[in-house]
Regions:
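N- or domain-start disorder-to-order transition segments that initiate the globular core
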Residues: 1-41
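Glycine-rich phosphate/diphosphate-binding loops that line cofactor/substrate pockets in enzymes
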Residues: 37-45, 251-256
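Conserved phosphate/anionic-ligand binding catalytic regions in large, soluble enzymes, centered on
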Residues: 48-61, 323
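Conserved, mostly hydrophobic/aromatic
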Residues: 52, 261, 327
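Short acidic, Gly/Ser-rich segments with clustered Asp/Glu that frequently serve as metal-coordination loops
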Residues: 54-57, 256, 264-270
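Active-site-facing alpha/beta catalytic cores
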Residues: 66, 79-244, 265-270, 274-281, ...
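Internal helix-turn-beta structural module
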Residues: 304-342
């Protein structure tokens, strides 16, 4: 038998009973969700900035980072909505390496999913409690949605997951914003088909239940660059790429046309410092075109306290143990620069 069953994990309801979201934080999340909805539906002219570590590996340093973000948020909240990236599951290109706090609450120890589910939820709740900022996370495993459905305000569907039917159908049951990334091939039609699927109702099997969903009108596109057949990275954040996406949106029956630009990954050729220039180019493109100003609703930026990255166990506080990130000083300056464009 290929599967070795280690232990049965608590259900989402059991975990949420153990670590509930306090009533005052429920209200904060409702307000944040409504703010983000207004941006994606065009009722608000604010701009989304989804920013934070590549992976949320340590509760103290992540919450330290989000507290810094909250102080900046006070200065820019009339123009921007800052959404901290608290990514607790990490897709790995080869399946090897650190897979996030949900798998390994201690990156230097073996996986412990029970402790990981508790650590993940505790970190998200602490961040909201201390800052009032609800976060974004990536949905790597659709069956885990119940563990975080009451605490997240934004969900990303990654380039390797966006073609998967269960991801698409699960998003159709969300009531929060969901960004569907272009696949690694860069095919816009695949991404838009994913948005179409997520925006429509479905019947399917989910965690042992027959379920119906009603569609998620906040599903939208995320451009993260592509990889060609030779393994070279190809950006797709340029003006002409955005115009092409707008034209394709116009031909499809989709609600709330919206796009967020991921400034890292293949768009930056994995050169994290390029995120600064890329973000500014995107903001400039929005100024040049009324259509793009309507379409591009936000950016994603990988950022932490210390710039770059380190190996697991190296011990530098606030430095990524996965992909390299912008440091805090550059990140803070970039947020203020984004606000100046608005």
């Amino acid at each position: 038998m290929s599967f070795e069953f280690i232990k049965k994990l608590p259900t989402p309801a059991e975990i949420r009973k153990e670590l509930p979201l306090p009533a005052e934080l429920v209200k904060i999340k409702e307000e944040r969700d409504a703010e983000i909805r207004d941006v994606l539906t065009g009722k608000s002219n604010k701009f989304l900035v989804i920013i934070g570590p590549c992976s949320a590996d340590n509760e103290d340093s992540v919450c330290d980072y989000v507290n810094r973000l909250a102080r900046v948020n006070e200065q820019v909240k009339d123009k921007l909505i800052l959404i901290p990236r608290i990514y607790t599951n990490k897709p790995r290109t080869t399946g090897e390496g650190y897979k996030g706090i949900t798998s390994q609450p201690d990156p230097e120890k073996k996986p412990d999913f029970l402790a990981g589910l508790m650590a993940m939820r505790k970190m998200h709740i602490r961040a909201i409690q201390e800052t009032g900022l609800t976060a974004a996370d990536e949905m790597l495993y659709p069956e885990n949605w119940g563990y975080v459905s009451d605490i997240l305000s934004y969900v990303a569907i990654g380039a390797r997951s966006v073609e998967d039917q269960q991801h698409r159908l699960t998003v159709s049951g969300f009531d929060v914003a969901a960004g569907m990334k272009n696949p690694t091939s860069g095919d816009f039609s695949v991404m838009l088909n994913s948005v179409y699927a997520a925006q429509h109702p479905h019947s399917f099997i989910y965690t042992g239940w027959e379920v119906n969903t009603h569609g998620n009108d906040l599903a939208h596109t995320v451009l993260r660059g592509a990889t060609n057949k030779h393994g070279a990275n190809i950006p797709n954040y340029h003006y002409e790429d955005l115009i092409r996406l707008w034209d394709m949106y116009e031909k499809m029956d989709l609600k709330n046309p919206a796009c967020v630009i991921d400034a890292n990954h293949s768009n930056s050729n994995k050169q994290f410092k390029e995120q600064i220039r890329i973000t500014k180019e995107v903001m400039h493109s929005r100024k040049l075109s009324h259509d793009l100003h309507k379409l591009v609703k936000g950016v994603m930026i990988e950022s932490y306290i210390e710039e770059g990255n380190q190996k697991v166990g190296a011990g530098c506080y606030g430095k990524s143990i996965t992909d390299p990130c912008l440091g805090w000083e550059d990140s803070e300056r970039l947020i203020y620069d984004i606000a100046e464009y608005e």
